Amino acid sequence: MRTIVIGDIHGCLAALDTLLDTIAPTSEDVIVTLGDYIDRGPDSRGVIERLIQVSSHCTLYPLMGNHEEMMLLSLQGGVSPFRWLQNGGTETMESYGFT
């Protein structure tokens, strides 16, 4: 069994896929992701979908990062949505088909 820690993916699905191909997680492995799955990179949606797939093959502990927190706060009125959009939220929205 291995414990694998991954941080700051930031919407970079190609890099995540390369990493997953390299480490080739098995059902005995534990992966801890440190948040910041979204924003900045071109495929936040793909990153989220890939992590959901990974969770069916091994134990995954996804933690929330500051970018996920900022997105949630902007949706709940805790921070200006423009702050989130300026910090990579635009790329996240585009990955879900919003322009």
Predicted regions and their residues:
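Active-site neighborhood of divalent metal-dependent phosphoester bond hydrolases
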Residues: 40-99
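N-terminal active-site segment of His-dependent metallophosphoesterases
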Residues: 1-50
